Amino acid sequence: MPDVELTWLGHASFRVDTPGGKRLYVDPWLSNPKCPDGEKEPERVDVIALTHGHGDHVGETVDLGKQFSPKLVAIIELASWLEGQGYPNGGELGFNKGGTIEVEGIRFSMTHAIHSSAMYGDGPPIYLGEPAGYVIEFENGTKIYFAGDTAAFTDMQIIGKYLEPDVAVLPIGDHYTMGPRQAAVALELLGTKRCVPCHYGTFDLLTGTPEELRRHASGVEVLAPEPGETITV
């Protein structure tokens, strides 16, 4: 069976082409300043997974939902809210931390994250459930941990022991999430030896770099694709 093909679309957005031929988008903010022009208008979307409700992660989810009707993987409050915004059957698969669901042959286990989750507009912020991460098990058995926006937390040890991810996708930009030094601690807690950094380089505030992560995370293979570049895992 083919490998998992992971394409970084800038910030915390990823396109994943699965061994079973499905196309998954994680946190599709395709209008982010680092997303290549050729990736801004997808030709196909089978599944969307959202880690939390901030605009730089929800991105174009509602528009993609209306265009392609993909299955939506999200915590129940966020999923229900997105259905109210026009996402067809958006709340159908809403679930919560500790739960595992199978969607299009892909298994999603929702994990804890330390962050916030709300949508901001003219009025008070709209609470959209707790932030989350996922360990995603693909059709060939490969497991990738998408941590979402988070700080390191000691229960990452449980994620590593119980869900056993092969690769960890971790934010490293600092300011809004953990930076490289704390991400190295997260990798030690997880016991994962391969890491794809994200949530860096989008704005001047996000100062963390893959080079700094490599300095702190000795013994870990840091895979740092350019925006639009595809790697196999």
Where are these regions (language model features)?
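Zn-dependent metallo-beta-lactamase
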Residues: 1-23, 29-34, 107, 111, ...
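Binuclear metal-ion centers of metallo-dependent hydrolases, dominated by the metallo-beta-lactamase
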Residues: 71, 83-101, 182-233
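Active-site beta-strand termini and strand-to-loop segments that position acidic
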Residues: 16-20, 103-104, 136-140
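Active-site environment of divalent metal-dependent phosphoester hydrolases
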Residues: 32-33, 54-59, 79-82, 99-102, ...
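Glycine/small-residue-rich loop that forms an oxyanion/phosphate-binding "nest" at active or ligand-binding sites
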Residues: 59-101, 106-119
